[in-house]
Amino acid sequence: MISTVSLFWALCVVCIVNMARYFSSLRALLVVLRGCDPLLYQYVDGGGFFTTHGQPNKQVRLVWYIYAQRYRDHHDEEFIRRCERVRRQFLLTSALCGLVVVSLIALMIWH
């Protein structure tokens, strides 16, 4: 029988791997964005997005831009595909993180 603690740690590893995939896809999206829409790139602070001096309010703008699917009217097909991918990975990673939190609470209650 598989230990519940082992299952929890496996779920944590899967969540971390998906977070890494999400950030990698987001970085690739910013590269495409810099080439196809420099104004939007500046609007979401593309140059300082992954730095310590990045502006969180501008970073949240990109997240909401993708979450609300406002990219669908964009002229560049590559950008639209990247946004779709980032959106799917964001939803998957959010669900996995929620599952990790619920699993941690359940693990604390039962052990």
Swiss-Prot record:
Positions in the Periplasmic compartment: 111
Pfam family, one: UspB
Key words of the record: Cell inner membrane, Cell membrane, Membrane, Transmembrane, Transmembrane helix
GO CC entries: plasma membrane
Residue numbers on the Cytoplasmic membrane side: 22-89
Cellular location(s): Cell inner membrane
Similarity comment: family membership: Belongs to the universal stress protein B family.
Protein name: Universal stress protein B
Species whose genome carries this gene: Salmonella typhimurium (strain LT2 / SGSC1412 / ATCC 700720)
Upper classification of the organism: Bacteria, Pseudomonadati, Pseudomonadota, Gammaproteobacteria, Enterobacterales
